[in-house]
Amino acid sequence: FQRWQFDTVYGPANTFKTFSTGKIQYAEPDKGLFKVEEILSYHAPVSAATKPSYKAIPGVHGEYWVCDGKSIFEYDYNNQKLIQQVLPAELQGQNIINGPLPFLFGANAADINRRFWVRAITSPTAKKEIWLEAYPKSAQDASNYQRIHIIISTEDFLPKGLVIFDRSYVKGKNHSRTVFSFQDRDVNFASTFDKLNPFFRNFYEPSLPSGWQKVVHAAPITRPPTRQATQNPNTPR
């Protein structure tokens, strides 16, 4: 993928703050990988006659996480730690779909409609594309973004683009948003030799880099909701 991040508050006013490239992979029911392989940051032009440049900053790394269906593994480059978050049993097998961006990780229409108000916004000039606009229904999703535009290719019916609008986005005033473009889309099929398939091998526990520390967080304990005692109808009031 290619990713452009716009930040009106901490970035330039008229262009993107960072440009990244990387890969996203997904395998049913709940295996996923998100890896930023290169991130370039905005550098202001040295004079009015020159253009801004984008350069890699030493020590700055993008996101890298893997979900194997039972745990999420995240690389913390700043602290040289591989963090494993074990998922509660009731979330294993469905964590990615319930995450912030279900459009990329196999959510079905029922799940999408449960979490979002969705409408078609395809322009008459769009070629071989379907554009959808999704507004979050829950406070949890609304805390992550204001709305999302999903661009679907009619050739393979896979997402070819995604625009995630920041909560503070205001057209003409605040352009904070994240734009994804998915160019090399591919569908891989499972087989009985998954462990020998390089595509599926990415979803097993990632290796620990030399000199790094592995940190394991146990699954959080989910407690049943507290029931309120019903009042005895014979109790005097």
Q: What does each model-identified segment do?
A:
Residues 1-79:
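N-terminal mature ectodomain segment of secretory-pathway/periplasmic proteins
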Residues 23-28, 53-55, 65-68, 146-161, ...:
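A short, surface-exposed beta-strand/turn
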Residues 29-35, 126-135, 158-163:
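Short, hydrophobic/aromatic-rich segments at coil-to-beta transitions
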Residues 37-39, 75-78, 87, 137, ...:
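Surface loops and adjacent helix of pleckstrin homology
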Residues 40-42, 79-83, 140, 166-169:
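Short, surface-exposed beta-strand-loop junctions and turns on beta-sheet-rich folds
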Residues 73-103:
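Acidic/charged, solvent-exposed loop-and-adjacent secondary-structure segments enriched in E/D, K/R, S/T
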Residues 108-119:
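A short, amphipathic edge element
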Residues 126, 139-146, 154-237:
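Non-transmembrane domains of secretory- and envelope-associated proteins
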